[in-house]
Structures are given as C-alpha cells and as structure tokens.
C-alpha cells in the first residue's frame, strides 16, 4: 500500500527556530523503494494537491529538515479547498503553539489521514485499492511545560467545500480518547498510565490560546 498512515514530530526550544527556507522541490524519499511511494502522477490523476502531513513551516529550524518535508512519503492527497482552508488554518495554529516553546517546553504532534477502515476511505486512486484517499484527517497534540501537561485532538472531514471566511478550529476539537476510538491508534503510549488516562479523557479549549 502506497499511503502513509501518520507522522509524528515535536516542537521544542531547538526545533521551533525559523532559519531555513521552503524548498518546493518534491522528490522521492531515498530511504524507501519507489514501489512503496506515491508520485506526482498519483496526485494529478484526480486533481488532488500534494498535501503535507508534516508541513514545510513545521520544520524551519534546519534546511535538511525542511527539504525532507517535500519527500513523497510525507505527501497525502488533499482537495485544494481542504488543503488551503481548514488544514492550513490548523497547521498555522499548531505552529504558533509550537513556537511558543521555551527551554523546558515540548509540543508533541501526530498528524494523519484515515485509511484503515473502509468507511473512512474517501476513494481510491488508480485501478486497484493500494492508493486510498483519506475521508478524514486528524491531529493529536501533547504539550509539556515544565512538569505540567495538556492534550487535545482535532478531527476533520476531507471535503472540497469552499472554506468559510472565518474558520473556527474549536469546532473540530475533541479529546485524545475520542480520537483513539475513531482511529484505533494509541497516541501517547509512553506516558505513565495514570497521567495518560487523565490527560486523554478530556480537554479544555481555554487551555489552548487562540482556539476560542
């Protein structure tokens, strides 16, 4: 199957920096055989954008890291209105939170699209079922500030609807537990069980500046 399920990265005092420039050179990932990667042909067949999972603007601390965001292994097919609308808006908000990190802070980010359940696949590209298009996209966030933690998730349907003039990201928010139920993924398994259970069961939009 030539589809990435999810990616994970973090913002911290080092990776929050903005010292690189956007390369815009879409290239194959040299670490993976081409038979397991999408190409421009796959995206162009049905008019999909090459949607970044890890955004170019997520990795500006180093040029090599930014260049790697243009690997085809980081691309997911997205309708243009979605890619440049609600997805872009959420990317920008996450980057704002990530770049607020100081020396003792870390924002852990997981992003992905749904391909494992038939009812969560939008369609397939090509003549077989090896290239699914996600019907939903999501993000899971865990913020560590000193000894305190907070978590939140987002779930959005992948449509080609024209974005609203004012995008309310709060409308897409949910708890990590709710996202895990939808995706079947255990997002932050390294946390202490008691802490994980408490963090993932609920969320507060007021705890995330700019969300309300």
Regions found by a protein language model. Give the residues of each.
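Short, His- and charge-rich active-site/binding loops that engage polyanionic ligands
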Residues: 1-50
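Domain-level detector of nuclease and nuclease-like folds
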Residues: 32-212
């Amino acid at each position: 199957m030539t589809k990435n399920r999810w990616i994970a990265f973090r913002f911290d005092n080092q990776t929050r920096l903005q010292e690189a420039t956007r390369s815009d050179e879409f290239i194959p990932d040299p670490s993976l055989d081409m038979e397991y990667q999408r190409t421009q042909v796959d995206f162009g067949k049905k008019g999909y954008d090459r949607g970044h999972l890890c955004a170019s603007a997520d990795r500006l601390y180093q040029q090599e890291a930014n260049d790697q965001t243009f690997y085809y292994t980081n691309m997911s097919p997205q309708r243009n209105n979605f890619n440049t609308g609600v997805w872009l808006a959420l990317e920008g908000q996450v980057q704002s939170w990530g770049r607020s990190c100081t020396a003792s802070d870390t924002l852990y980010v997981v992003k992905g699209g749904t391909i494992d359940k038939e009812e969560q696949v939008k369609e397939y590209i090509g003549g077989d079922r090896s290239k699914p298009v996600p019907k939903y996209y999501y993000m899971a966030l865990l913020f560590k500030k000193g000894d305190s933690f907070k978590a939140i998730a987002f779930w959005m349907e992948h449509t080609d609807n024209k974005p609203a003039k004012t995008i309310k990201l709060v409308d897409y928010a949910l708890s990590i537990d709710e996202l895990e139920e939808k995706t079947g993924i255990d997002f932050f398994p390294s946390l202490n069980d008691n802490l994980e259970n408490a963090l993932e069961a609920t969320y507060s939009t007021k705890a995330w500046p700019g969300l309300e």
